Amino acid sequence: MTADNNTEALDSSTTKDVIQKGISVVGDLLGVVGFPFGGALVSFYTNFLNTIWPSEDPWKAFMEQVEALMDQKIADYAKNKALAELQGLQNNVEDYVSALSSWQKNPAAPFRNPHSQGRIRELFSQAESHFRNSMPSFAISGYEVLFLTTYAQAANTHLFLLKDAQIYGEEWGYEKEDIAEFYKRQLKLTQEYTDHCVKWYNVGLDKLRGSSYESWVNFNRYRREMTLTVLDLIALFPLYDVRLYPKEVKTELTRDVLTDPIVGVNNLRGYGTTFSNIENYIRKPHLFDYLHRIQFHTRFQPGYYGNDSFNYWSGNYVSTRPSIGSNDIITSPFYGNKSSEPVQNLEFNGEKVYRAVANTNLAVWPSAVYSGVTKVEFSQYNDQTDEASTQTYDSKRNVGAVSWDSIDQLPPETTDEPLEKGYSHQLNYVMCFLMQGSRGTIPVLTWTHKSVDFFNMIDSKKITQLALTKSTNLGSGTSVVKGPGFTGGDILRRTSPGQISTLRVNITAPLSQRYRVRIHYASTSQITFTLSLDGAPFNQYYFDKTINKGDTLTYNSFNLASFSTPFELSGNNLQIGVTGLSAGDKVYIDKIEFIPVN
């Protein structure tokens, strides 16, 4: 089986379950990252173990998911060795979590004696060393891509475990030197695990590049599913550093994922567009925006028998906005074919569209098959009023049957809540691609993670991370470029001195609340960052180069530019400028962090 015809092998409940587990783990982590964890730490461990370690089955499913995507099998010896290691790790982690739970429940001195300290140190060290010794079993030569989801989940558990030495090490009786050694190890492994995941994600993606529409569908499935189970996870690794993040962290994932085209591969009979046409046509790296309006165009498709004629979604415009409170409306180019029927406008204006359910139909002629999307119901949620509702595009002629549901590919974060609360992704863009021979259009929907805050609210209690791609506008000479894979989204790049961007922020705390700022950056030269509020400079400092010209961006390419002077957010528009760049230099900017100062 080749990449061009492997698409249908992935349609299974197993794949949906694997994706749901990956989404659930990331969602749980987003709720607890940063310190102090308090009682939430043991609760997280318990939920995590129940999600991925109720048995060995989830780990088998992680492996089978990538095997199906790559159309390749892991050798029995390698799979059996990995599963045996995972069983041992499960035993070690469960023993440690049980001891940690008892430790937290019994703060009195009689319980926390040298014996109990020694016991929890022993269990922690056993679990931690077992991870170090087991990780090579999830990176066996020739199977690195197939083990990648397993590797990422195991790496996440190891790093999350390691940070406990910084929280409890002194209580447990570790010497300061031992605690420092654990911290050094955590930093080293964060870099090692992150770079491994990015490298082998890209290797797998490149292997799936093809020429046909069918190969693009499989390529995009790999990109989407590995984003959900690997790249989203590694974006959170730095937040386990409790020395850098001594408070809870409010963060978000701004990357896009594309669901499968609504028109199924089997219905196209070779009439889909080409791999390069669809890949070159999808959105390039861009400033983050949210869905405002879709204008649907409709055409009539006659059928050979007459009664199989139907209307279909033939094209669309999309309108978006950069952030809540902005009056700017960005209108897309037109996608598809213009309407021969009245257009339909659906306006969302910031409500979270968390599900799309589509109807399709076919018209069969002796020489061809014509396929089209006839109806789409969009479920949306207003998180300000706590109300759910639906809007529908309806072609109003022979709409056929439901054949596509976004939840099958982007399952909810949790099933313990109604879908409008437990959903994982929200719609932010739609496109249409023309089939070959003018046989209809292929709609494709783009989604972003529910963690994104459309208001850019700065929390007065937590460290707030905002991606600089959420800027409302860019300085001349600044561009949005593809992220390196571990940042949770795209990043900004500048090659000359000047203003990088303007970021609109909002606060609910009193204006007297002060903050410090850090910028996550990579630079080929020593630079000076200048911060201004509504045009008035308030912070300026120089920072070291982090990379050489021509270097590929890896985890250690980035550093944190920390400003020590606290300030009050007396304005809404934050400008970031840079000087110190010469010809050939580049500075990359990922996120800005706002740290509340008491």
Regions found by a protein language model. Name each.
Residues 45, 70, 154-155, 517:
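Long, contiguous hydrophobic alpha-helical segments, chiefly transmembrane helices and signal peptides
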Residues 1-9:
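Membrane-active, amphipathic/fusogenic segments and juxtamembrane/transmembrane anchors
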Residues 109-448:
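Membrane-inserting hydrophobic helices used for pore formation or membrane fusion
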Residues 50-107:
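Heptad-repeat coiled-coil amphipathic alpha-helices that mediate oligomerization/assembly
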Residues 10-74:
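Membrane-inserting effector segments that mediate pore formation, membrane fusion
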Residues 15-22, 59-63, 79, 93, ...:
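Short amphipathic alpha-helical segments that mediate assembly, nucleic-acid/protein binding
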Residues 8-11, 15-19, 480, 566-571:
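Intrinsically disordered terminal tails
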